[in-house]
Amino acid sequence: PVLLGISLLAFILGVLSPGGPAEFVLNQDGLYAPSEEQLEAMREELGLNKPLWLRYGLWLMGVLQGDLGSSYITGRDIAAEIAQRLPVTLELAVLALLMAGVGGIFFGSICAVYRGSFFDNFVKNLTNIMLSIPGFWLALILILIFSEQLRWLPTSGTGSLKYFLLPAFVLAFATMATVCRFMRGALLTEFGRQYFLVAKVRGINKFNLLTRYALPNAIIPVIALLGNYFASVLGGSVI
């Protein structure tokens, strides 16, 4: 029922969007407005004159059979379009996930171990700034510095790792701050639990206390957080 409701909502939003598919197909370059006769002919060709319930039913039956339809822009099968872009999306999402996860867990762990220190306070203030910076603004600044001024990284294209560094870092930037805070809080919670205090009394060194006792338990909710983040990146990200 939930998936059916989401599909119905997505279909209705597509229908209610301004312009409509017929006008979009006929006027992709935006240079002229098609006549009403042209629009009517295109609506007939695309099946847009059929009742809304019938159009939704035909679309849903096609989706259930693996037919996602054709793109209004390219005319190609949508499944083929997704298959063409999915590998690049996966590469970008995985790299952003690694940046956010490794950076957030590393700095969050240090902040928890040295709670109340200058480094802890500095990182907490830094994460406030990171969470308040818009992604598109950060992307523009990084492009100006690393692409326009230093000429180190490209601004577009795909291929080697250097093409993914800037967009992946921008996608991971705010999430890294969230993971850092989450990791710090989770570790501090584990530091106060009885099993950790008993292990500490037994004289186990700090590194083993962190890596063998606190970290395995504290990292579980962080992994769940990163899983949700990964799903959102795969669902579509705009910088």
What would you call each of these model-derived segments?
Residues V2, I6, A10, G14, ...:
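Juxtamembrane/transmembrane-helix interface segments of polytopic membrane transporters
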Residues G5-L54, R151-L166:
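Hydrophobic alpha-helical transmembrane segments of membrane transport/permease proteins
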Residues L9-P18, L46-G47, M61, N125-P154, ...:
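Membrane-water interface segments at the C-terminal ends of transmembrane alpha-helices
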Residues F11, L16, Y72, A96-N128, ...:
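Transmembrane-helix boundary motif in ABC transporter permease subunits
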Residues E37, P51, R55-W59, V63, ...:
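Generic alpha-helical secondary structure signal
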Residues A41-E44, L58, G62, A80-Q84, ...:
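Short amphipathic alpha-helical coupling elements at transmembrane boundaries
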Residues L48-I105:
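An internal, D/E-rich "acidic patch" concept
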Residues I82-F119, G135, E148, T158-I239:
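Alpha-helical transmembrane segments of integral membrane proteins
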